[in-house]
Structures are given as structure tokens and as C-alpha cells.
Amino acid sequence: MKKFVIFTDSAADLPKSMVKDLDINYLGLICNIDNTEYIDNIDSELTPKAFYNKLREGIMPSTSQVNSFRFVEAFEEYVKQGISILYLAFSSALSGTYNSSLIAREELLEKYPDADIKIVDTRAACLGQGLLVYYAAQMKKDGKSIDEIYSWVEENKNKLCHYFTVDSLDHLKRGGRISSTAAAIGSLLSIKPMLYVNDAGELHNFAKAKGRKKSLKMLFQELEKRIVNPNEQTIFIAHSDCVEDAETLAEMIREKYPVKDILIDYIGIVIGSHTGIGTLAVFFLGDTKEP
């Protein structure tokens, strides 16, 4: 069986320990704060906790994709050794990172015509993307081939459910997801939007919750509707500095389902730049992505 490596990018928000344990190659997107550029990799000097404290101070970060040059540099190290590459990319609907990787592949194929570089537009983000990478890495550990893993991810990426809620509407307003009027009314009425990632990898609103407690209940209810074979699943929960809510949601899940495991971790600095503080998300395999 041919040798291969798995790549992803930092939009997957996988914890440092998991990236190292599962031997995943990681490329960091970039977060810009006060004219300082931070590469969002597993050894980033800006921790999620410190990042969210900066958001509380009113700082508004911006982000940028991984460019094709960095992909060429990272991929070529393996290609020139004849090692195949499987890259699971951040949703093309949310970032140009996937397109950068395609440009890099074409450039490398001109130099190395026999290079085997498989690229998947996961149409996923945050720990939803991370969960696909986790399953891919576990399959590699179990001896599956690159072709088997590639096929599994392509077949299952539109069953990877992303459901989340945000505590503040400010960042959605800034990103053009809702109007200033809707944000003002929503904040006044304590309305919490409920969102999901659709089959195209785009963010969409599917409901509104009155208050935080109701929004957590609705996340759990969406999981109840969609989850398949829960006793065989590892569920990921991501939060932007609201770990108590994440633990509450995890307990709701454990009380009903004998899941294999639940991982709770921070939303990273790139995704967090667009969601803001108080976002809570749950990721799992379901019958369909759509609510």
C-alpha cells in the first residue's frame, strides 16, 4: 500500500494533542489583530483564551486564507519523496483556501507529473471539518488506503451535521449575515439565531431561540432529529469561551445517548473572528446535513 499523509488547515480547530497523536499535517490560516499577523497553527503564540479577551476589549480582527505558495512549500516536501497527499479543506463557500490548494496542485503536477495529491472540499468548518479529519486519521491508523479514505470522506461529508448558536449578533451584522436593524432588535429581545452549514458548505439560519437556555435545548433537539448510530459516534462540541454551556450540552447528550466520546474544545482564532464570543456548536454524523 502506498505511503500517504493527511493534511488539513486550521479552520478544522482540532486540539493540539489530537493533531500530534494522529500525525495530521496542519496549515494555519492567518488572523490579523491591530496590524499584527498571527498564523493560526497548533503552536500559535495567541491562545484562544487570550484572543477572546481581546474581542472583549473591542478589537475587531480580520482573517486571510492559506495562499498557494504555502501549499506548494508544504506539499512538495512529501511529493518529492513519492508520498501521496490527502488534504481535507475548509469549505470553499467560506474561504479561498481550497482554491489555493488546487492552484498549488497544478503547479506541483507540472514539476512532478506522477504526484498523487487528493483534495477534498469538505464543505465543512470548525470541528465539523475537524471531525471528518479525525475519522480520516482513525481510518489511516486502522490500515485503510488513501483511496478508501478519500471515498469515505466524499460519501459522508454531506452527513456531517453542523448546528450552532451565537450569543451576540454583532459579528453576524459585521459580516453582512443580518442587517443592523435585525441585530438591534434581536439584541433587545434576547433572540439567539440558530444556524447550520448546508450541503454547499454555506452558513444559513434555520430558527431563532428566545434566550440562551432555549438555544441550547434547540441544539440538542436538532441532534435528536438527525443523529444515526449514536453509540458508534464521537461527537465534537466547540465553543468561543463559554465552556460551561458546552459542558451542559454534552451532559444533555450523555443522558440520552451512549456515545463513544464527546470532545469539547475552543473555536479557534480564525473561525472565532467571524462568530464572536459565546458561540456554541455541535458536530456529528446524521442522516442529512439539512435541518
Swiss-Prot record:
Keywords tagged on the record: Lipid-binding
Signal peptide: none
Binding residue positions for hexadecanoate: 63, 95
Domain (DegV) ranges: 4-286
Entry keyword annotation includes Cell inner membrane: no
Molecular function per GO: lipid binding
InterPro entries associated with the record: DegV (IPR003797), DegV_C (IPR043168), DegV_domain_contain (IPR050270)
Task of the protein: May bind long-chain fatty acids, such as palmitate, and may play a role in lipid transport or fatty acid metabolism.
Protein name: DegV domain-containing protein CPE0026
